[in-house]
Amino acid sequence: MFGRDPFDSLFERMFKEFFATPMTGTTMIQSSTGIQISGKGFMPISIIEGDQHIKVIAWLPGVNKEDIILNAVGDTLEIRAKRSPLMITESERIIYSEIPEEEEIYRTIKLPATVKEENASAKFENGVLSVILPKAESSIKKGINIE
């Protein structure tokens, strides 16, 4: 057969539309585990729960460390960042790009436990933000003795 399969362009368009949708408007997600996430822009995250802490990992390509703001209070973590525009010279022009233009992105995450925000730590390396939030004593599971 000569040329492209006609389904290639259909699937390519569907793929782009599917992944572009969460990048444009404000979204709200509630997981089956009760975690609520709202936000805007492209910021994939993972939430990992340990016995003593909660770890949130956010993928932030194209973001500088100085352009990230973190706030935690109670059982909520907020991540805000600003993605810089592509740097091109006057003699260049963008003819196609899937990389978002300059944008402000954020996530507000209702965590599965109350955290000690004053003991939280974060690091940003190779476009990946890792935030570790120790659980508050009242959120740590404790065994109950039966008499």
UniProtKB/Swiss-Prot annotation:
The keyword Cell cycle does not apply. Pfam families: HSP20 (PF00011). The lineage of its organism: Archaea, Methanobacteriati, Methanobacteriota, Methanomada group, Methanococci. GO terms for biological process: protein complex oligomerization; protein folding; protein stabilization; response to heat; response to hydrogen peroxide; response to salt stress. Belongs to the small heat shock protein (HSP20) family. SUPFAM superfamilies: HSP20-like chaperones. GO terms for cellular component: cytoplasm; protein-containing complex. Homooligomer of 24 subunits. Forms a spherical shape. CDD domains: ACD_sHsps-like. Signal peptide: none annotated. This is Small heat shock protein HSP16.5. Its main location: cytoplasm. Residues 36-147 form the sHSP domain. It is found in: Cytoplasm. Chaperone that confers thermal protection to other proteins.
